Amino acid sequence: MVPTDHPKRLLALVSFAGILALLSFALWPVFLISLGQEWGLSNTDIGTVSGAYFMGYLVATPILVGLTDRIDARLVFLGGCAFGGVGCLGFGILADGFWSASLTWALVGAGLAGTYMPGLQILNARLDDAARVRSVPWYTACFGIGTGASFGVMGTVLAFADWQVAAYLGAGGSVLAALLVLFQVRACPPAPVPASQKKRHPLDLRPAFRKPVALGYIFAYGTHTYELFAFRTWSFALLVFLAGRADGGFGIGAVTTIVSLITVTGMLASLLGARICLAYGRHRVIALIGATTALVSLLVAFSLTGPVWLVVLGLWVYNGFIMLDSGALTTGTVEAGDRHDRGALLAVHSMIGFGGGALGGPVVGYVLDQAGGADMIGAWFYALLAMGAGSAIVFSIQRHFWRRMA
């Protein structure tokens, strides 16, 4: 099959490769309860292992994403798949406690740094301006499909096999993603630097800090990602806790299905939010989404003592509101950049974004420990408030730009 240049087919192909590369994403969130007990970890330790994934992403991002301004992003994507595959194999073979799990899981996170934004750069380099603006929300929304599919696969493995099988499946996803991009995406050299501008070192990220509007989206993305990945890390454990409280209970299979559906349907919310931003103004819409999402987190926290079905529905709605501004924030950063420095902007976008993601899991784990543990309703109340703080900060940042540009 010949590599495609058609915008829609290219978007579908790169998005599917990204979904395959994300197959390992839910390995730790799904198995953290059983492995935490087996390895004698506290909730703070569990959250820190989760955060190691995003720290790996954070450390690798300036190198891997910054390189996409100098070399074909397709090559960076292949390198990211190699990191992810080796990390999954290392986790399956070597992980037996806090440090070994953290180090190997960080390598898997570094793999994501080489596939997520470089995948977007594959599209940016091959699409015209109009197609790029239309494609970014779809591509970023597919992150939700990938994570939802990962929860489905890893939850099924939890029911029928063990965590090592899950790790090997994650490695297989990275291999398939690499093969797809290698053989189905044509090579494309990076854009030449304009003669009026000095050639920039790939690790020189200063262009991002010269664009205040881009920084507004970037820092808002950091607090958004803090909340999103705190939710992703702990939602499976929260639903397992709720399952034990339900009349008659419900099993791991039901929890897996619920988390997968919650995650996948978040993609629709991301696309909807991007469309609303185009119609009513990006800063204003994101600010209002942030305020509403913080309020929803508070309402869900107060609903924890109510019927389990109501809490599950509330979590579903909460995830949807978290995702409403996800694609819009990334699109804002892309639009604020130029072709020759977009890699630098996306590198900073990813670093600050996933730096926030690295904090989400540990912060919520610490809150759970301090409030009595993950088997206490009161602890989950404060955990949800800690998550919702991210959207409150998004509101504050974007309100500033909304007012300034009014």
Locate each region found by the language model.
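Extracytoplasmic gate region of multi-pass secondary transporters
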Residues: 28-29, 214-259
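Conserved MFS/SLC helix-loop-helix module at the cytosolic interface between two early adjacent transmembrane helices
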Residues: 59-95
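C-terminal ends and interior cores of transmembrane alpha-helices
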Residues: 82-96, 292-305
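Cytoplasmic helix-loop-helix junction between adjacent transmembrane helices
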Residues: 104-142
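Helix-loop-helix hairpin linking two adjacent transmembrane segments in secondary transporters
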Residues: 139-185
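Multi-pass alpha-helical transporter architecture, strongest
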Residues: 179-184, 383-406
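Flexible cytoplasmic inter-helical loops of multi-pass small-molecule transporters
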Residues: 183-204
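C-terminal transmembrane helical hairpin of 12-TM major facilitator-type secondary transporters
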Residues: 283-329
